[in-house]
Amino acid sequence: MEAALSRKTAKKKRKTHTTRGYRKREQEVQKLIRATEGRISGPEHDMEALSLQFFHGFEGEMQQENDFAVEDCQESDEDSGGELAEEPTDSPSQTFIHIDLHDPPLAWGQLFKQRHYYDESLLYRPSNTLHFQLHLSDLSELKDSQIRMLNRYQEQSKSKSGKLGSDLIGQLSGQKPASFLMGKHLYRSVCHRRFQSVFFPPMPPSELKGLPSRRCLKLCLKQLRFSLHPQLLEEHRLAQQLEDLFDVYSQQRKQRICRKLREELEIARQVALKLLASAGQDQTAEVKRQLKLTRQLRQRYYAESAAQRNLLQRLLKEWAKLKELRRQQRFQCTRFQLGLRVVHPPDLEASYCAWKESFETDLAEVYREHLELFYTRLRLWTDQKSHSRTATGHSKPPRKPQFDRIMASLRKEYDKTFKDPEEPYVEVFRLHADEATARLSIPGGDQLPKARNYFLKIFLDGQFVGQSRTYRLEPDLQISINECIGVLLERSLPENLNIWLYEKSTLTPKSRRLAQISTPLVLSSKDDAVQEKLSFQALSSTQLAGDVYLYYEYRSTEGWGSALHLDDVQRLPDALRQTLLPQSLPALPQASKELVTPRPPSGRIKKSQLPSLIFAEQQLQFCGLDVLLDNRRFQLLHSRHQQRNLHTKQLRFVPALEQEISEEEPLPDGRGTVQLLEPGTYWNPIDLHKHRGRKFLQLLYEVIASQSARRAKALQTPLPLLLLAEDSDRSSGTGWTALWRAFCSVFQGQRNSLPREPSGWSGHQSAPDLFKSFCVSLHVVRATGVPVRSRHILNLNERRSSAGGDMSTSLFVTQTLMYSNVRPFVTLSYGQRLCRSRTAEGSNPTWNEQLQLQIQSQFGDLRDDLKISLFDELIEQQYSDEASDVYQRVQCNWLGEFRVPINSLLASRTFEGCIELAMPKVLVGYKRPLIDSVTNMPTDQYPEFKEAVHLWFYLSIEPGGGDLAPLHSCALACAEKPELQQYLDERRLELQQLLPQPQRYVEPLVCTAQGKRVCLTRLMDPVPLPPAAVPSGENPLEICIRYVSLLSHLRSYDPCQGFRGVWLDNQSLLDSTWCSVKDLGVLLCNYMLSLGLECWLILGVSCPHGECSFVLFRQPETAELFLVSPATGKRYQLQDVHCPLRRIYCVVGKQNIYFNIQTETRVSMTHFNLQDGACWFPLFRRRVPAPQSGVQKLDYAYKRSYELSQLQKHIERKIMKKISAWRTTRKTIWNRAFQPRLHKILCDMEDLSTFSRGRYDEPIFSEQLEREFPNYRLYGFTLNFAYTNLAAISERIRTSCIHYNHDASVEFCVAVHLHAHANDVLSVWLFLLSMVPLVE
């Protein structure tokens, strides 16, 4: 069955018969193949192998070449008419037709009837001469076939913009290797070109990478944009799409494709008209090709115009959609803005004429093309009809094109592609809004998006080369970087560019890596800058993706565009090198190692041994690299140079010898990276605790201020017309009460009193960080109780005891002799600026003088204190060897000071009255002017003699702190019930009618550290006591007062420190040990509640802290009321005129809040009967009790302080180093013989300050020192303050001016004692003493 099927198929197979001419040409080809068999060099090839190579050898190569050449040839084929693009690129085997010579040929009937013309000019005859220069020994030996193959491959390489491969030349040349000998003579050639020399240092061959070539890679980062982000909104998506469309629109307008196509179309039409005018029979194909090119250009022009018009329409639609979205959502979070430039045609008739002319030209051209197509089809149909003999049916003739349909079709295409003559010209451009004028707003809500910071790291082939700055993410989810990074490349060029995207945390110094962006670098010095848009997506999340816009360029370092471009050097293959280079000569026969004739040893030939090669850098090395890195002096110098180690950062001298370097503290490894802040190693733990606590409180204030400002802006609405009163609140604009108050305010007028603080919804004020010049004025009137010099008093006491009389009869004479030996003067200083008053005399001096101090600084830098210091001018008579030479030496001894925080003065503008100077506990060389030391009369009869030094003054600053924006605490969320808030609003309206001054009103709802508002009474809650003040301890009240007074105060001009600011709870305060002055009163009042005392919190104004809190408590033994200042720990009686509390606003208890409605402003004249309704206004009633508890942490656990021995040594060294540095012109001598005695005195000072209740017992210590060391003239004092950092200690010592003693024999001694409380609250005690030996 299968055999029958095969025979049937064999019978049906039709063979192709060849003609006689074909067989003749085939025989000639076979004969040529046989003739060239012996000429093929190398291994013999049989006919079968040649046939396989002919039919199948080029299929793989042609396929690869076609894959790479499709894109290159496509555009050139289209420009040439599109004919080449339609031709298939097949291998020779695919174009071969198998012809059987035995079968007769089948010919078409029409083939013999057509007339054929032969044009000899169209025949291709390959040339037998080389078309390029080939460096060979003898070109005449090349055969014609080799020359034709070389020309063919040369043309193929030119079409691919490449070079002819050297390996192919070696295969086709077939030259014998040249025979020549290597000569030792060198000849100098002449070359007119001067080459630039390159320094090439010696190096091993394994490290050789090529000639040193210095190139510069300029990488510019333009923009970072997020397309996917957790904060992405619909407006972001539309704005990014619109921006991408506008970029495409701008690129099209910049390239002007339609204009260029229009010009090319006009040129093609002119060429076609000329060809048609002078066309002959031999130029028909050229005319057809030109007409075809014209048609393709017109179609491409229509397509580009339509695409550009559609893009413009889409751009306008998207822009309208974005504007509608912004209008509906009532906020804008992107900056993208577009503008339209509409230009109407100036002359409609000219526009119509141009449009009509263009349309008629295209219509005629299209109609001619349709006619040509019609006539071609008609001719083919006619020929087919005339020659068709076997066809049974006749096909219909082609129909002539209808002009109306063609015109309608072209008109429809014109409407889609081009604009109407009456349509105006529309151009879209982008509006670049300035940062200052950009009006961006974000949607309101409780949870606002946090600020995110990002930066980029650049890597070239895995090597880090640069990093961008840190930028904050804008509301439009874009970051404008605009940074350029230059990389100097030597020898090797990078291949890949990697960019890592990092997110920087706002609270910690760590950063989080988000995404990696990789792209290959196309580096070519001949091209322009390469612009790229790189997309990325986060590694850990799919909700973060975006694009990075950048461009880079590669140029020589000698100049941009000035260097000559060198050709690429192609390395010859090994096969060609063996062919072109001569073979090596045969080696000479080696001589025998043993000589033929034996000779004595002295006659043997000595082999010359060459010295070993040593590089120059090795000869210049003093020692090995490992030895250098292990050297301790090099480690010190390297660590000091890096400025990273705090131990070596301030070294001024490094010993030259290694044995002179002490090994007390190990140095870090210089080859590793050292962290700047490492707790316990480079910073003292207490310093680190203080530093972190200060940063925590500053960050807390910044976060709450930012949150309140955003909430206030989001909730800002137009104020109602009922709010006519200037001091009214926003919540009072509702109800009948507000309507009645509005009518009253219209008829009665407004009060002229200014509010104490601006309202929470006031407009935007000027920035507080502008540079300003301040003038501080101090009018000092008089002082009482100034200490006097003790040696005069001792002499007077001896005189009194020797006389044995009663000095009460001559009290005036006694006071004149005792208290006139001191010459005090007052100084006003801030930082390094100082001004002083004139010198007065006596213990009760009077100056009545005004001092002015100019301060030039910014608000952010005003953190120091204004110091009002009291000095004694001591004049000593100095005698020389000659009796006629007498001169004086003036020495200033510090007696005390009064510190005014600059932020309080800026907020209050003025301070006046009587203040108490902070005097040292022990003042050696001086004594208090107590009346009981010279007479037996009671002290009550002489009120001018007190234990404290008082100063009457008036202090002011111009300009004040009016530019500080208030904290919008009213916009924060409230934790109280709405009913309570409404009740407080009603009570506030009643209270404002009774207050004598509107400044007395304090908002009862305050902001806590959690960012929410609560009632003031919730802050009053018993909290755990410090460990030293447990009820079983001795006098726990005094210990609590002392502990609170040692907490650190934050000195900054910040509205968060006021009554409408942030109130801290006990956990935030005690963990950070930093707070404002008002927070100290809350903590002390809670301590008293834990002790079971009856106490209240007083809110008012004091000198020098401004708005602060005092504590009013009742002593259990005597039921007497006392006022306690939490900042200083001093207690005052209610009638004490020297109490620093100036005004009282309200009294806060655990059960109620009482507002002061008394007309009397003096505290000493204020009635403190809280049940008297005529003096105090209770905020809560029985039916509406005050809310309690919920803020303080009732189970707070205190932490134990760190070891203080190391810190005490650091403080002592710091003081000695600073005093020695300040005395640059004098030698500083330290006498350590006094130090044990001073330490013993300081150990008793803490208990004396805690339990003495403000009394001064320093005569005991000062007189003991003077008696123990009678051969020295002593002057010294003690300083006590809370520890913050070492810089604050240096500033206090510099203010005392103890280092200004210019006596040649003066000696100094310093003693330091630290008393630790819980949570690293330290009390620092310093004893500074200067002594001058007395000459007998």
UniProtKB/Swiss-Prot annotation:
Amino acid composition bias (Acidic residues), ranges on this chain: 70-89
Tissue: Expressed in the antennae of chordotonal neurons and male germ cells (at protein level).
Coiled-coil stretches: 136-156
SMART domains: C2
InterPro entries recorded: C2_dom (IPR000008), C2_domain_sf (IPR035892), CC2D2AN-C2 (IPR028928), CEP76_C (IPR056288), CEPT76/DRC7_peptidase-like_dom (IPR056290), Tectonic-like_complex_comp (IPR052434)
Keywords: Cell projection, Cilium biogenesis/degradation, Coiled coil, Cytoplasm, Cytoskeleton
Cellular localisation: Cytoplasm, Cytoskeleton, Cilium basal body; Cytoplasm, Cytoskeleton, Microtubule organizing center, Centrosome, Centriole
Pfam families recorded: C2, CC2D2AN-C2, CEP76_C, CEPT76_peptidase
Transmembrane annotation, as ranges: none
Major localization class: cytoplasm
Region (Disordered) residue spans: 1-29, 70-97
Domain named C2: residues: 755-915
Domain of life assignment: Eukaryota
Compositional bias of kind Basic residues: 8-23
Entry GO terms, CC: centriole; ciliary transition zone; cytoplasm; MKS complex
GO terms, biological process: cilium assembly; non-motile cilium assembly; protein localization to ciliary transition zone
Function in brief: Probable component of the tectonic-like complex (also named MKS complex), a complex localized at the transition zone of primary cilia. Required for ciliary structure and function.
Subunit field text: Probable component of the tectonic-like complex (also named MKS complex), composed of B9d1, B9d2, Cc2d2a, Mks1 and tctn.
Name of the protein in question: Coiled-coil and C2 domain-containing protein 2A
